[in-house]
Structures are given as C-alpha cells and as structure tokens.
C-alpha cells in the first residue's frame, strides 16, 4: 500500500509543481505587457559589413518583450549578398526600398532550376557539371516575404540602389521551441553577432557552466583541446574541425578550411564582384510562371487538395495603390496581407498591414482584437496616440521615418499624418488573421438608446454620432467638417 501511495503523492507533487511553474511563467509573460508608457524605438545596434549594414532593436525593450518579437533592418548595397542563414523564429520581411532575388532551401523539395548542358564548360580534362538548385524568386519594393522557421535563405541585390528591408522575428511563436532569445544561425561566413544583448546572457550561462566542479564537466578539458581550432568563426560550420568537414563532404582539406571561414572579415553581407550568376528566368517569364502556379493553386483548393510547401507562394506586394482594401481619396488607403491572401502566413501565424495617409489624413481610433501590432514608419511624419484600459494615453507623440511603435493587443490607437507631408507606415501583426475593431463602427452597430443612456446624449446628438461623417475608418478633417 505504501508504494502506490508514494507514487500518487509524487505524481500530485509533480502536477502541482508544473502548474505553479506554468502559472508563474504565464504571470511573468502577462506582466511584461503592463505598460504605463510606450516609447518610439530606433535601432540600438549596428553591424557594418563589406556590402551593407545590419541594424537591430534591443529585444529587452519592455515594448518588444510584451509583443514577443525582435526586429532587424538590413541595407544591402548593389551586388551585395546577404549570406545564407536561418532562425528558429518565423520571419516576415517587408521591402522598403530596392529590388533583388531571394532563395529558400526547402527540405524535400526538388531542384527545379537546372542549367542547360550546352552551357557547361571544360576545365582541363574534367567536365564541369551543370548547376541546379531550388527556385529563386524576385522581389521589389512593397513586397511582404514570409520565411518559415528553420528554413535557410539568402538575399541578393541585383538593382542599382541600396536594398532596404525590415524583418520581424516572432520569437514567441509556437514554432520556436527554444526560449524567447532572438537567434540567427549562419551557414557560412564569419558574421558579427546581431543581438549583442543576447550574447551577453549566453556568455554568463557559459561562465556558470565552466564554474562547475571538475567531476561534473564530463571530459570537458579533452573537448577543449580537440576543438581549439574551432574557436574561430561564427557560422554553424565553424564548430566542426576541418578534418571532420573534409570527411563529411568528401572534399579537400583546403576546401574544408574555407567552409569554416575562420578569417573572413566581411561579416554577413558580402560583395559579389561582377554580379551573381544564377539560373533565373527573365522578369516577364517569371511573372507568367507565377500566374500559372497561382492558377494551379486555386484549382487545387477547389479540388480539396492542400498546397505542398514546395509550391507555396512566399511573397505579396501590398504597396500598390490598386491593391488597397480600404480607400478614401482624401484620407489615404490600407492594404492587408494575411493567411487569406497569402496562405503561407497561416503557418507563420503572422500578418501585415500597409497604411498610406495623405496630409492631415486620419486612421480613426481602432484596436486589434487578437494580435499585438508593431508600427514602423516608412516615410513621412505624423502623430500616433495609444490609450490603455484605464483610459490613459500611454503614447501621444510625433513619429518620423525609421521609428518603431508597439501597440499591445486591445490598446486603442489612432494615427494622423502631418500637415506638410503624408505618413506611410507598415504594421506587423502577431496573428495570421488579425481582426480590427473600429470605435466608429461600434457606435453605428449599437442601439441609439444604449448610446443615449451611456453618454447622456439627446436623440439628435446620438443620430449625429451614428450617421454623420465618413462611414469608413479613414477620415480627413476637412471633408468631415464639410459634411457637417
């Protein structure tokens, strides 16, 4: 009888402890969103590369910890190549400026781009095999690009101007089975750390590990001696010896040493002399192929067949005026990319919104029902107001190009462009089907008598509140005054 009793007691204690830990963890997560003040954030860290610049926001900002995300802004010079990398956190990229090509390596997908045999060259007595690789996609200004968790990708600027992109890493996403620390794994090169704040935390844990008694280190000294050469380089291959890599890839020792990139000082964006030579159809041909693929995807959907990851569309342009979901000729326009328009976002559980406000244009008070949002100013200037559940304005300031503002879930927000120029901004959202509720629409959907008693209004005032003015969320003050 004692053994079953002890087993039951142990199980009860385990469940109780797990519940307490889960409750404590959930409390800590929720406590991070108790924001009495929100700040407009700008990049905190810069990494200069041979052919570009990488800027990151400190992930320890309370606003970013609340949203559970990290952000990177990259500037890639013409002929610049951002080296292959991946992250345990899904990424959503917006192209602010320029154009280029991107390549993803999707597991289990065929290498559908093949070099014709007629183009193969001879080197001495040996024939060079024609190249083949997975599909390469073009992108341009205004594109949203979805990168799934753990999928390696590279980016190349084939344009004449710098390529500027901002990336959101959803570190709190269910796909990330690690902690909320932003991590970027580079397959090649010797890149500088992009989030130095997280490196400091990792170094502290490393020092704690080395402070353990000798008996608990498990042959650590021997491992340190064997991996002395592995201390150079910051790519994932830098952690393996040249000899091991030579055996693994069946290559020469010199090639294996280059794979480790121990003395490469170019960082994560390198210059490609003479331009990148890849197999890629011309722009018009590629557009025709994408239209055909889109048609096939539509037919598969009607037949009840799911898309495979190999055929999923990863980009969509949301900055074109004709793409607008909401439009007011005097106030501005709003375009949305979610899992309904770009199905791959269903796996990332992310979405985006592009807003263009003309001079003095207003995006009326609204809130995100099921998502945190991050507002990044692309161009222009304006004013943003955010109100919390206590009715306090936690943010009421001017915003300018390059600034980031976090809007927590259900906090009411309103934006207005300045008098001198418009306001153009992107909103990342932590839900693939983020829903928005507008205060104005709520009033129109509420019975008049409810509003009269709630606000102490006369019937005429209620009618004016419900029916006058613009019926959409985009408002221009002058047109509103004329309608009244």
Curated annotation (Swiss-Prot):
Signal peptide range: 1-22
Composition-biased stretches (Low complexity): 117-129
GO molecular function, one term: nutrient reservoir activity
Any single Pfam family the record assigns to this protein: Cupin_1
Region (Disordered): 109-141, 196-236, 275-304
Comp. bias intervals (Acidic residues): 284-293
Keyword Disulfide bond belongs to the record: yes
InterPro entries per UniProt: 11S_seedstore_CS, 11S_seedstore_pln, Cupin_1, RmlC-like_jellyroll, RmlC_Cupin_sf, Seed_Storage-Functional
Domain of life: Eukaryota
Domain Cupin type-1: 38-257, 316-463
Record key words, sorted: Disulfide bond, Seed storage protein, Signal, Storage protein
Disulphide connectivity of cysteines: 33-66, 109-310
Record family assignment: Belongs to the 11S seed storage protein (globulins) family.
Subunit structure: Hexamer; each subunit is composed of an acidic and a basic chain derived from a single precursor and linked by a disulfide bond.
Described function: This protein found in the seeds of many leguminous and non-leguminous plants is the source of sulfur-containing amino acids in seed meals.
Protein name: Legumin type B
Species assigned in the record: Vicia faba
Gene from which this protein is expressed: LEB4
